[in-house]
Amino acid sequence: MVMAALSLVAACWGRAAADESVQLPAAPGSSVRARETMVSVTMATSEWIQFFKEAGIPPGPAVNYAVMFVDNRIQKSMLLDLNKEIMNELGVTVVGDIIAILKHAKVVHRQDMCKAATESVPCSPSPLAGEIRRGTSAASRMITNSLNHDSPPSTPPRRPDTSTSKISVTVSNKMAAKSAKATAALARREEESLAVPAKRRRVTAEMEGKYVINMPKGTTPRTRKILEQQQAAKGLHRTSVFDRLGAETKADTTTGSKPTGVFSRLGATPETDEDLAWDSDNDSSSSVLQYAGVLKKLGRGPAKASPQPALTVKAKATSSATTAAAPTLRRLALSSRSGLERKPESLSKVSIIKRLGAAALVPEAQDSQVTSTKSKSSAEVKVTIKRTLVGPRGSSSSEGLGAQMDHAGTVSVFKRLGRRTF
């Protein structure tokens, strides 16, 4: 397509040249100039066709626009001066083509400026730079200054030839891309050097696998010591709370399960089954047990006061003579001595029969008579005694045997035995 457009343009210029040759006389050397003009026009047309193609114009309109630009002698340096009115005068009426051409004109102008700047800067450094650096004396500095002044001025940037403009633009674009890549790589390297080194990733036990632990075999003194410590630690078993508090006794575990009688609760010594059966028979046969010799007159003189606390008895006597109550209380206090004298053993070992006394075969229906130790008082007094324990709780059970009750009703075992000893 491009070749066809070029051939068309060449044919047009050829016909115009033929007409001129017919009308005007041929001048010497005119054919050479015409040929050069044709070549330059063809190259200019090809450049403008390429320009319009890069701007996005279709090939047909691009050829027409290129011919119009060549006919109106539009140069590349005039691209920034183009506007909508000028484009309409040049025959470009399509609005989209106008906008595309104006945008691409700005881009091409920028590329030409970059190319001119790169060509103006020398590629290799001047050979006198090393000598200037090495020159330390005044003479060497004068020589270098004179050489700098005498050096020819730098040539102005020459307009590139139209034949090599496309190649130069492509090379400048490639150089700019390479320089941009180099700067990006340098910036990336600097960032990597300044960046903090990444922390090492932690390897978990699942990723690494199972550990193999080699236990000491006891070949060295240190390993033997470690094994001894482990054995000692294994020997110390952990004890429970019950082991640390002590084992429970059999009596503690069986106390609540077995029924206990009144005699076991009073602290009596365990007796045989025959004695217990005989005691129960005596209790059932006699409703009232009489105390033998409780109020008898003691043959011995008054003994010294017992170290244990005496039993305080509150007596209520119904009699016409009130002076006979005091001797009776004295005899009751003295009668407790007989119970204390026959206590050689501990109270827990005294049988129930001994503590109760011998049972009378025939219960007396009449009240007992109280006789005073004094010879002056011979009157009979009927005494009703009400015992009340006021002493300490730990008093002996034998102290409650010093009085005889005067009612003929049934007396329970607890009343006959007295309070429980602790």
From Swiss-Prot:
What CDD domains has UniProt attached to this entry?
A: SAM_CS047
Which residue windows does the record flag with biased composition (Acidic residues)?
271-282
Question: Residues where Phosphoserine occurs?
Answer: S124, S126, S151, S280, S306, S351
User: Is the Transmembrane helix keyword given for this protein?
Assistant: no
Q: Which keywords label this protein? A: Isopeptide bond, Phosphoprotein, Ubl conjugation
One matching Pfam family: SAM_4
**CC annotations in GO:** nucleoplasm; nucleus
Instruction: List where Low complexity composition bias occurs.
Output: 310-324
Detail the disulphide connectivity of this chain as listed in its UniProt entry: none
Position(s), cross-link Glycyl lysine isopeptide (Lys-Gly) (interchain with G-Cter in SUMO2): K250
The name on file for this protein is Uncharacterized protein C19orf47
Which organism is the protein's source?
A: Homo sapiens (Human)
